[in-house]
UniProtKB/Swiss-Prot annotation:
SUPFAM superfamilies recorded: ArfGap/RecO-like zinc finger, Nucleic acid-binding proteins
Keywords (A to Z) from UniProt: DNA damage, DNA recombination, DNA repair
GO cellular component labels: bacterial nucleoid
Lineage of producing organism: Bacteria, Pseudomonadati, Chlamydiota, Chlamydiia, Chlamydiales
Protein name as annotated: DNA repair protein RecO
Protein family membership: Belongs to the RecO family.
Record GO biological process: DNA recombination; double-strand break repair
Annotated function: Involved in DNA repair and RecF pathway recombination.
Length: 234
């Protein structure tokens, strides 16, 4: 069976000879696909297989064999990202987040669209690392692992006008905070909620114009989510 689908190459690794195995994120989820002679200069779609490239792929799927890339039409090579260390570092953070949270072949059309939009806009922001942290928050929201209530998970006391503590997917008051919780001031919590509730990219772009020092806390929050995820795996 042959299918045509859009996809963003997250990673690729060499196979024997000049073959390539690409990890592609698409609306159909994470896919691993084999490209015969994909690293060869004679391959007319070689550039479409490079990491951080958006392409339209023709893929052959004959279970139980691995998917095979028959053709790739490069749509966006994201050259600006590849030519900047800061942008590469920030984009790499988003890629690793996807690789660590998404199941193989689990359809994620909304997350795919979100990631593609972030890739298209990250070169426009003066603070790409903060912008990539916004993606981590959006990913937590997508996974249903971000408590947006206004009360402590344990005692249900109101947190609307106070400092809050977050860990994994939960929200805590000062009394029930523990050594692994991450403190968010009232202002930081407000910014977090603005990011999560933003419906338009322009809102995120406006926030990313300012050097808001919250990205390290968002990254730590995401790391705690990954720890929780690993602990529940069989």
């Amino acid at each position: 069976m042959q299918i045509i689908l859009p996809g963003i190459v997250l990673t690729h690794s060499p196979a024997e000879k000049q073959h390539v195995i690409a990890k592609i994120f698409s609306p159909a989820g994470l896919l691993s696909a084999f490209a015969k002679n994909g690293a060869s200069l004679s391959c007319d779609f070689r550039e479409s297989l490079l990491p951080i490239s958006f392409s339209l792929f023709t893929i052959q799927h004959t279970p139980p064999k691995m998917r095979k890339v028959l053709q790739g039409e490069l749509k966006n090579p994201f050259t600006t990202i590849k030519n900047s260390y800061r942008l590469l570092q920030s984009t790499g953070k988003m890629i690793q987040a996807i690789l660590k949270t998404q199941w193989q072949e689990k359809p994620s059309p909304q997350l795919f669209s979100l990631f593609l939009n972030f890739l298209q806009r990250i070169p426009e922001t003066p603070h790409p690392y903060f912008f990539s942290s916004m993606f981590l928050l959006k990913l937590l929201q997508h996974e249903g692992s971000l408590d947006l209530s206004h009360s402590c998970t344990l005692c249900k006391s109101s947190l609307e006008s106070s400092t809050v503590y977050r860990h994994e997917g939960s929200l805590f008051c000062e009394k029930h905070a523990h050594e692994k919780t991450i403190l968010f001031s009232q202002e930081e919590e407000q910014i977090l909620r603005i990011i999560v509730q933003a419906k338009k990219f322009q809102e995120l772009m406006c926030l990313a114009e300012f050097p808001i020092d919250i990205d390290s806390k968002i990254d730590s929050l995401f790391s705690s989510f990954l720890t929780e995820k690993m602990n529940v795996l069989p």
